[in-house]
């Protein structure tokens, strides 16, 4: 059994950790506002890319290519009493969709959990292989 499986599963753990951190950042900033639509927090999303390996056509893991900001417009709300409002009384809220972020959080958590199970299964198989000679 190839020990490459631990590298592959480890790359998935790392990628899903970035995804969870991004979700946490989006949720933490979901209620922040600004008087300037260009200064308001924008939802972020990680971009994943397969790691190419000519020696292993079955796959070699995943890497985070980067984190991109959503291009959706900020939400404009009329709040003239808000100290952060612009001269017309508007504040701008992030383009964070709470429901979508919760779905992303659950999905990332499940993917992370699956990768941990892959590592545990590979470890158990390796231990059983070592015990064959006893």
Protein language model features and the residues they cover:
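Amphipathic alpha-helical polymerization modules
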Residues: 1-134
């Amino acid at each position: 059994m190839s020990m490459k499986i631990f590298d592959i599963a480890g790359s998935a753990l790392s990628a899903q950790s970035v995804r969870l951190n991004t979700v946490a950042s989006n949720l933490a900033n979901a209620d922040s506002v600004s008087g300037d639509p260009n200064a308001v927090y924008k939802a972020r999303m990680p971009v994943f890319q397969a790691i190419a390996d000519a020696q292993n056509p079955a796959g070699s893991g995943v890497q985070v290519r980067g984190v991109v900001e959503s291009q959706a417009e900020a939400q404009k709300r009329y709040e003239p009493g808000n100290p952060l409002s612009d001269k017309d009384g508007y504040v701008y809220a992030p383009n964070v969709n709470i429901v979508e972020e919760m779905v992303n959080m659950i999905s990332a958590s499940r993917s992370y959990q699956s990768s941990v199970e892959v590592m545990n299964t590979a470890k158990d198989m390796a231990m059983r292989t070592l015990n064959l000679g006893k």
